[in-house]
């Protein structure tokens, strides 16, 4: 009888222990669930407003070279001006030679012989081996420590995928994806050998949040996001930092927005935020080798990702409605313009 009592005693003690463990587990889970959004909020605010980014010089000293694609206008031009001000020589690549010459002349007049510039007119949509061979000749022997993958193309107006012109689809993929791959692959061996370097690739909310009526563009930018996260892990052991830079709307020719606001910075404001937050995630929390550095874009991405989910049906539906409206207005404008002619 005593042995049975002892046995039952052990069982009762064991049961009590299991109950206590379960209670503690539920309590800890509750505390974690309550604390997680608070911690996440603190993290995003610190990253966007308080903590500084890494210094550019940690990726390559002044006097080394920065290569910028899509350099003649908008964001690319502002990157060129900002990097020249910080003492970096420039390789400017874009489609129109006259615009490149004008930018190079502006930089030369401001900084004189302290900053060297090289230019190459190149239509990335053509994907010509001869163009990439010319680019390779241009950079051979140069210490290129910074690469800004900025060249990009979107649809002329929002358009259903079934109606997207074949040439437009091809150009978007060639410019956004293939050009970025080929230029990066051309420069990474040198960065690896020098054990330092910075690769910034301009992405878009259109790739982070699925965007109906911009399906090809959205897919191309989603590709850049996945590729950057994978490439960043590959190059990190070699001292090369990769950062996919996410953004919402900016006052550029691509967005067709002219007036800046709190939600829509101009290129200069966006570039300043990007270079001041190198290595910081901003609103792109828990996304490897990715940053959303501009404050309003960062808060927007963080909120949507945390509380709705970047690929949730609600977000996709909102995106579709917004771009259907943009398409209707664009078509009406085209009709009015046609009647005036």
UniProtKB/Swiss-Prot annotation:
Keyword field contains Mitochondrion: no
EC number(s) recorded for this UniProt protein: 1.1.1.330
CC per GO annotation: endoplasmic reticulum; endoplasmic reticulum membrane
Keyword Transmembrane: yes
Binding residue positions for NADP(+): 67, 123, 131, 150, 217, 221, 250, 252
Transmembrane regions listed in the UniProt entry: 22-42
Primary location group: endoplasmic reticulum
GO molecular function: ketoreductase activity; very-long-chain 3-oxoacyl-CoA reductase activity
Pathway(s) it belongs to: Lipid metabolism; fatty acid biosynthesis
The protein's role, per its UniProt record: Component of the microsomal membrane bound fatty acid elongation system, which produces the 26-carbon very long-chain fatty acids (VLCFA) from palmitate. Catalyzes the reduction of the 3-ketoacyl-CoA intermediate that is formed in each cycle of fatty acid elongation. VLCFAs serve as precursors for ceramide and sphingolipids.
Family label: Belongs to the short-chain dehydrogenases/reductases (SDR) family.
Record's protein name: Very-long-chain 3-oxoacyl-CoA reductase
